[in-house]
Curated annotation (Swiss-Prot):
Motif 'HIGH' region mapped to chain: 40-51
Residues that, per the record, bind ATP: K572
Keyword presence, Lipoprotein: no
Reaction catalysed by this enzyme: tRNA(Leu) + L-leucine + ATP = L-leucyl-tRNA(Leu) + AMP + diphosphate
GO BP term (any one): leucyl-tRNA aminoacylation
Gene that encodes the chain: leuS
Lineage: Bacteria, Pseudomonadati, Bdellovibrionota, Bdellovibrionia, Bdellovibrionales
Intervals of motif 'KMSKS' region: 569-573
Enzyme class: ligase
Compartment(s): Cytoplasm
Keywords: Aminoacyl-tRNA synthetase, ATP-binding, Cytoplasm, Ligase, Nucleotide-binding, Protein biosynthesis
Protein name as catalogued: Leucine--tRNA ligase
Superkingdom of the source species: Bacteria
Record-linked HAMAP family: Leu_tRNA_synth_B
């Protein structure tokens, strides 16, 4: 080919940078459009083709919106604190600050190679003090509002990583990072009270343009349940405990109680003969993660030797412990109704505990709705009636109360690692307090020894000079845990709008103009982690009066994974990783961008097909030859278009416009391929067709579009040239296919002119074999004809 993509791609990247083509306007009368990609962890392994699939959709939309009159903010930065960077530093012996900076430089270079239209003047990194100063500032807001607190809680402890992990960081009993075993141990931790926002987080999902599966994922994670909190007495003792149930109507079916092994009453109520068995069971449970306990199929447990008193009947009910009951959920104790709960039924069957039916059914366990039996004053009622009557009875007799509960737990927010934001908290003998705002940022000290300790003590605890804090003559001790990686990413979208502000995390004017994010693109794996945490922090900032919108991301789109050629997830261990730099060298950045867009729907996983990118490269070469010959000379002409080509050009502009708006990029490229084929068939190289083709190609293959735009003497940058308009009258079809009915029964179809008369339609219908067979030699007695829609011939 006459055009060398290596040369012109670098050329246009420089021209865009020199022209500051993609910098968002600080003040503008244009409507705003904030397109954001989830920023990457700057890992030493660099970016792979999957990252390109993440950033291409947002860039296509950004480029499209920019040339349609929007003031576009499309920034990029780095989620630079956290476990991945620190683990790599420990493995290599190089400080994480050094490895992270090197990785960021590598990421930036790769992203620029592919022509993403990021506003690089707004680049951020969460590990920079001028950024995490404001992460600490927001934490202080949480602390001041009582939403950040310390508490000894059972936590997910990873011995290999030597830190605690949040629930969303544990997958199948192992750490998300590295796949190391995780156990449950009690530790004093910082927690964020996300549970205070459970109802708002749940209800406000309805106003978001998000994939339904993601919204449903958050609904399930929040897990709202309406029911009753019922008080049980320990038989023969003064102690009481509570259970939460969504089925108070089944209270008469309770035949045993189960407590979590960690329940504070367990050791107190356990009888002497059962003490050893209970102690051993508690020790065994401590070795299991929460996920293991939920996933276990075989029910295990131990009888405590104690009994509860049924609050209505007064019956004695055995109290057991079992690891399928979690202290973190509900009250840490359950009333077991084995006749109507499969899990309780399995437990009762295994340990020969009585089973009682309180719902009419022919089989047990029966978990559906039926008429109440064996339930005294509830007998004969349906579920709704029985629940209402039982709730009234419990409240009138002070045995229980109505209650709403959530599965959502408070966010475990501290890590016993080095590479993270220091907490702006100092502990004194008489209590803890936040540092004054004018002392922010609390700088993460540079230390040589940053390896985590086996004891669970954070590495910063070994830095005595840093830990010591003087407030006048009062000595305190800095908090030595650090924040999790999710801290910086819970608000980064707000820093982009005003990244150089030294007086505040962002200005009120910038927030009011830019927020919320109009399009957020990222993976569905963040459903119950980052996406939930970002919503929580935004709502807190809204309550603080710092933001005017209580939801950060109005529209969310997920990109599917690019799988290896073998159909498996790309990984170095499988040897199926595709390097974007290699593709850029062999086929060009535009070919990769266009191929990613053409592979299939944005949200679907797609296997890498080497022959596919070859085909896309040929498609781009064919467009090039419509403009220049092999010597690089202009061959595009100024000839008029035939009516057929003119109509197809307008149809293609409309199709690509609509497809970009709906993020159906693969069908947009298909439409351009059809146009290119027709231009070659008609031997048409007119700029009246090729110029708009190049413009609608630009969001996908921006470098080539700029080069061809320049060859055709296009004004200014193609990346900023107004999007081509289409004429709807030229987009209308000349013919239409309509159904033909005889006496209301469909007999076939005809293709006729859009404006065909009734006589023309009837004549065409008579030529259809199935219609003619019914009509014979008769003429219709009545004709019902709606142009372009239906023809019904009535024959007596």
């Amino acid at each position: 080919m006459s055009l060398n993509f290596t040369e012109y791609e670098a050329k246009w990247q420089k021209k865009w940078a020199d022209a500051k083509a993609f910098q968002a306007e600080t003040t503008s009368s244009k409507p705003k459009y904030y397109a954001l990609d989830m920023f990457p962890y700057p890992s030493a392994s660099g970016l792979h083709v999957g990252h390109m699939a993440s950033y291409t959709p947002g860039d296509i939309i950004s480029r499209y919106k920019r040339v349609n009159g929007f003031n576009v903010l499309h920034p990029m930065g780095y989620d630079a604190f956290g476990l991945p960077a620190e683990q790599y530093a420990i493995q290599t012996g190089v400080h994480p600050a050094i490895t992270t900076k090197k990785a960021i430089d590598s990421f930036r270079k790769t992203l620029q190679t592919f022509g993403f239209s990021f506003d690089w003047s707004r680049e951020i990194s969460t590990c920079e003090p001028d950024y995490y100063k404001w992460t600490q500032f927001i934490f202080l807001k949480l602390y001041e509002r009582g939403l950040a607190y310390q508490k000894e809680v059972p936590v997910n402890w990873c011995p290999a990583l030597k830190t605690v992990l949040a629930n969303d960081e544990v997958v199948d009993g192992k750490s998300e990072r590295g796949g190391h075993p995780v156990i449950r141990v009690p530790m004093k931790q910082w927690m964020l009270k996300i549970t205070d926002y459970a109802e708002r987080l749940l209800n406000d999902l309805d106003k978001l343009d998000w994939p339904e599966r993601t919204k449903e994922g958050q609904r399930n994670w929040i897990g709202k349940s309406e029911g009753a909190r019922i008080t049980f007495k320990v038989h023969g003792e003064k102690d009481t405990f509570e259970v939460f149930t969504t089925r108070p109507d089944t209270l008469f079916g309770v035949t045993f109680m189960v407590m979590a092994p960690e329940h504070p009453l367990v050791k107190k109520i356990t009888s002497q003969p059962q003490y050893t068995a209970v102690e051993n069971y508690i020790a065994d449970t401590a070795k299991k993660s929460e996920v293991d306990r939920k996933a276990s199929t075989e029910k295990t447990g131990v009888f405590t030797g104690a009994h509860a008193t049924h609050p209505i009947t007064g019956d004695k009910i055995e109290i057991w412990i079992s690891d399928y009951v979690l202290m973190d959920y509900g009250t840490g104790a359950i009333m077991a109704v084995p006749g109507h709960d499969a899990r309780d039924f399995e437990f009762a069957t295994k340990f020969n505990i009585p089973i009682k039916s309180v719902l009419e059914s022919d089989m047990l366990p029966f978990e559906g709705d039926s008429i109440m039996i064996n339930s005294e004053f509830l007998d004969g009622l349906n579920k709704t009636e029985a629940i209402s009557k039982m709730l009234k009875h419990l409240e009138e007799n002070k045995l229980g109360v109505r209650e709403v509960q959530y599965k959502l737990r408070d966010w475990l927010f501290s890590r016993q690692r080095y590479w993270g934001e220091p907490f702006p908290i100092v502990h004194f003998a008489d209590g803890s307090k936040g540092v004054p705002v004018n002392e922010l940022p609390v700088i993460l000290p540079e230390v040589a020894d940053y390896e985590p300790a086996d004891t669970g003590e954070a590495p910063l605890a070994r830095n005595a000079d840093w830990v010591k804090y003087m407030d006048g003559d009062k000595e305190g001790r800095r908090e030595t845990d650090t924040m999790p990686g999710a801290a910086g990413s819970s608000w980064y979208f707000l820093r982009y709008i005003d990244p150089k502000n030294t007086e505040a995390p962002f200005s009120p004017e910038a927030e009011k103009y830019w927020m919320p994010v109009d399009l957020y693109v990222g993976g569905p794996e963040h459903t119950v982690g980052h996406l939930l945490y970002a919503r929580f922090w935004t709502k807190v900032l809204f309550d603080c009066g710092l933001v005017t919108h209580d939801e950060p991301f109005q529209k969310l789109a997920h990109q599917g994974m690019i799988l290896g050629p073998d159909g498996e997830k790309m990984s170095k261990s499988r040897g199926n990783v595709i390097s974007p730099e290699d593709i850029a060298r062999s086929h060009g950045a535009d070919a990769l961008r266009t191929f990613i867009s053409f592979m299939g729907p944005v949200d679907k996983d797609k296997p890498w097909a080497p022959t596919g990118i070859d085909g896309v490269k040929r498609f781009l070469d064919r467009i090039t030859r419509l403009v220049v010959n092999d010597d690089g000379q202009l061959v595009a002409t100024s000839e008029a278009l035939t009516p057929e080509i003119e109509k197809l050009v307008h149809k293609t502009i409309k199709k690509v416009t609509e497809d970009i708006e709906s993020m159906s990029f693969n069908t947009a490229i298909s439409a351009m391929m059809i146009l290119v084929n027709e231009l070659y068939r008609a031997e048409c190289r007119s700029v009246l067709a090729v110029k708009p083709l190049v413009q609608i190609l630009a969001p996908f293959a921006p470098h080539l579009a700029e080069e061809l735009w320049e060859k055709m003497n296009g004004e200014g940058l193609c990346a900023l040239a107004p999007w081509p308009k289409y004429d709807n009258t030229l987009c209308a079809d000349d013919t239409v296919t309509i159904g033909v009915q005889v006496n209301g029964k469909m007999r076939g179809t005809i293709e006729i002119g859009v404006a065909a008369s009734e006589q023309e339609a009837v004549a065409a219908a008579k030529a259809v074999q199935q219609v003619a067979a019914v009509l014979g030699d008769k003429n219709p007695d009545k004709v019902i004809y709606k142009a372009g829609k239906i023809l019904n011939l009535i024959v007596k």
